């Protein structure tokens, strides 16, 4: 056991003495030491229940003959950080989480670890630590929140964000907005649609790093507690088998995950997190792989924000495994998972308990919702290194569009203008200097896109940014434009009124300005300098472009 280095032999008497100070007995010294890495806190709805899941995990570890030791990581709520400087700290927190897990696990020589994250950057941070450390590990994602129910329809956090835009446009009363505010977020769990947190939970299961059914089992469901307990039991077996993440996750595993991503219409943030995760596993995952697999993998289930169904419906219809079942002819079924079985072997044991709902909301390869997957990668004179759009959530009328640019150098300026009614049908809103370095921190533009949506403009207005979007964003919203403005990317050269061409079927994003004019602008271009201090200053110096996953040196 790895932990032998801190607990065996006369020379380790002092180490054992410290362990005994925590209550460890001599008999426990002979058992595997398991880290329970918990991102519980009291301000993030997706994390307020993780203390209970950690207790279940620890019970499972003890049942199987291990000794659990719990420690905590940070966790940022993107919803609470949205629309102000706090969002600059969200993406950077991913690497902080990964680094702190490495520090704790390496310093204390744990034999294995159970990782308990829920929300947007916390799940990838935990996964990246699993790839970097490569000790036996299993992930228990915290599970979705139940949807709200207002005015005889299901609602979620995005309903509230869009309600703000509707209120500003005079389409919603203050009392109606208050009702949405009070009733749309029903309690513990990640926001109730196929937004970033739930997309990453699905990616975790598709990669084989969590037990079957974990991704969609809801935060308040007893099934989640049982999965947590079973995960605690399983980690002890993983230690004995020396089955580590790099023996489970391969290039083919990432291809499987991307195909599932395309089928469920997942968040564009996967194009940041999966390449960064692959990097920690010693693999490469370029943007072109996403687009190649999108062209051959159909979109099979219409989930919020691009459709009517919530994670609750998806879970009842069979969850990730039900989609894997539909995609079986395309997937690498020989890939291993943390339960020791291959994806194909897990499928053999799959029971669909609600066959009617399964058939109603998860379509087939022969009759999909869309022939292509949920995400498209666009390139052109405005994005030479690429950009991404959730094409599954774009109105057909806006899949091909050319319009005049309305340019803003930060999200706050754009929001004021949108809410003031300055943005008109046909316009293309450009928000720049919001990339990984330029922000710094690559903020999400959900407040802006939700305001546009709430004002009824998503069928006529597009938004382009070198920042990124929430998984809750819908409409013709193109993000991760690379190179970013602060690095001299063409998005920094756009002026008000310039025509921009968007062609999603052809994967084109062009600035309709002559080469001669662009060269003139480039010669005079000086990106604004932002004074940043503390962690953001270190992050700005070391972060890489969005098209490579925004990894940090």
Curated annotation (Swiss-Prot):
Its cofactor is [2Fe-2S] cluster; Mg(2+). It comes from the Archaea. It catalyses: (2R)-2,3-dihydroxy-3-methylbutanoate = 3-methyl-2-oxobutanoate + H2O; (2R,3R)-2,3-dihydroxy-3-methylpentanoate = (S)-3-methyl-2-oxopentanoate + H2O. PROSITE patterns: ILVD_EDD_1, ILVD_EDD_2. Its EC number is 4.2.1.9. Mg(2+) binds at residues 78, 120-121, 444. Binds 1 [2Fe-2S] cluster per subunit. This cluster acts as a Lewis acid cofactor. GO terms for biological process: isoleucine biosynthetic process; L-valine biosynthetic process. GO terms for cellular component: cytosol. The modification N6-carboxylysine is found at residue 121. Pfam families: ILV_EDD_C, ILVD_EDD_N. The keyword Magnesium applies. Functions in the biosynthesis of branched-chain amino acids. Catalyzes the dehydration of (2R,3R)-2,3-dihydroxy-3-methylpentanoate (2,3-dihydroxy-3-methylvalerate) into 2-oxo-3-methylpentanoate (2-oxo-3-methylvalerate) and of (2R)-2,3-dihydroxy-3-methylbutanoate (2,3-dihydroxyisovalerate) into 2-oxo-3-methylbutanoate (2-oxoisovalerate), the penultimate precursor to L-isoleucine and L-valine, respectively. Homodimer. Belongs to the IlvD/Edd family. This is Dihydroxy-acid dehydratase 1. It comes from Methanosarcina acetivorans (strain ATCC 35395 / DSM 2834 / JCM 12185 / C2A).
